Amino acid sequence: MQRLMKFRVLWGIHMSCPGFHHAPQHLRCRSLSGAGTLRWNDYDRPEEFNFASDVLDHWTQMEKEGKRSPNPALWWVNDQGDEVKWSFREMTDLTCRTANVLTQTCGLQTGDRLALILPRVPEWWLVCVGCIRTGIIFMPGTTQMKAKDILYRLQVSGAKAIVTTDTLAPEVESVAPECPSLKTKLLVSDHSREGWLDFRSLVKSASPDHICIKSKTLDPMAIFFTSGTTGFPKMAKHSHGFALRSYFPACRKLLQLKMSDVFWCLSDTGWILAALGSLLEPWTAGSTVFAHHLPQFDPKVIIETFFKYPITQCLAAPSVYRMILQQNYTSLRFPTLEHCCTGGEALLPEEQEQWKRQTGVLLYQAYGQSETGISCGTLRGMKIKPGSMGKAIPPFDIQIIDDKGNIQPPNTEGNIGIRIKPTRPIGLFMYYENNPEKTAEVECGDFYNTGDRATIDEEGYFWFLGRSDDVINASGYRVGPAEVENALAEHPAVAESAVVSSPDPVRGEVVKAFIVLNPEFSSRDPGELTKELQQHVKSVTAPYKYPRKVEFVSELPKTITGKIKRSELRKKEFGQK
């Protein structure tokens, strides 16, 4: 409990939520609309919006008036059993102090950029909201970054400040001389470091009195770096409208969160999904955000956490659910879990069914990008079509388009497009910062071209095929890599795979699979195993999709966000640099 005591002494606050309180029945079923804060509809465009004043401070007032149950706004734990519970009143106090540190101590102004590279620690929430209060543009980044990744982000963004931990401080120091815009370095640590400001002590001594800026809905709020699967990461710039979209009724239907919910998003803090799932979505509904520090991913710890804490909803990548299912537990019937959502990579229909069978909870799928947030999904309570990404979520009008922006009929392969004309929808990125060429490149007629390929069926459900650059044209047949990778994943030998096109003197292109084997299959004869895997794919999907070439590898090239870099493998196949 030493760390817990440090938090209490450090921030100078009392722990107002010593235990978890189930909401009174009359509050338990109240969603955002029931709390009287749903001021906008799906297609409204208010002139002003600020998540800190319109959401966080609203729930602070609800707590003062006794209109919200005494559950914490943020419930943070670590693997040592320490806990931090902050109410909305405490979050308002601490984020106002943070805002004053950023503006008064650091001298940052509205529109300045701040690089935020923190793990799942409470200070991540303070900095995010502190930036929103002041109009400082925050740029989340994963702690998996190396010095060259940090250098690139600091240089292209012109960041004036960075907030990180002592683990990454040496990496920052090694590149700081090459970043002339960087003026302020804030350290989140129990130890001081020369050349760095002590974030915690500054927040503790700062004034809690702060007037939130009156931000325009279309003023910039955050920059999210894309995954960089096809080149250097781009800076997708988002307005305050990105946070406003979580207010809209159609978006509320995706998770249908209540004040009594305890919501756990397992996304890395450097990804846009964390901003949505660990900040915007749950707090818009007045729910409790649950966070586990999880310095190392361990499915056993995740399972034990579900049993130990009253978590009601979960949002995580398919790999998280997959690893949970692979553990040898006699029961996965978590006592309070009601709803699960996933996205970010392909999910096998068999995995959805297995999750439902072992946990008794349905697993809903969603789709999005750094540019869009969650743009379509299977809403809670909606019919699940296993393997589908669900339907478009307003205000996004999503269609399947060709390369000229023409809408395609159902069951026809094309690009996933989001209508941007005559009006760009609230919640879609503004543009790629400092990259007008790329911004223009993704505009296709009346649509933003996501670069992802899919089909849409007669009921409006989308079916993902892959990135446009990833789709393989084999002997006239178009093959999406996700289809083949899903088929391979059903075989027990395959830990993970990446499917790309490979040159062939007769067919032009053929399907090739790079496969990482599970350890127990590593001693198998490669030739025999290749034939077995090829036959397996033929048996579970259209035979023309099977990989004519197979290469076993120890690992796959990935971006720092964990996405497979198929482009790198494809270039290798075609002898490109």
Curated annotation (Swiss-Prot):
The gene is ACSM1. Keywords: Acetylation, ATP-binding, Fatty acid metabolism, GTP-binding, Ligase, Lipid metabolism, Magnesium, Metal-binding, Mitochondrion, Nucleotide-binding, Transit peptide. One of its GO terms (biological process) is acyl-CoA metabolic process. This is Acyl-coenzyme A synthetase ACSM1, mitochondrial. The modification N6-acetyllysine is found at residues 146, 204, 214, 356, 391, 531, 538, 549. It comes from the Eukaryota. The keyword Acetylation applies. GO terms for cellular component: mitochondrial matrix; mitochondrion. The modification N6-succinyllysine is found at residues 85, 146, 183, 204, 237, 356, 391, 538. It is found in: Mitochondrion matrix; Mitochondrion. Gene3D superfamilies: 3.30.300.30, N-terminal domain of ligase-like. Residues 1-31 form a transit peptide.
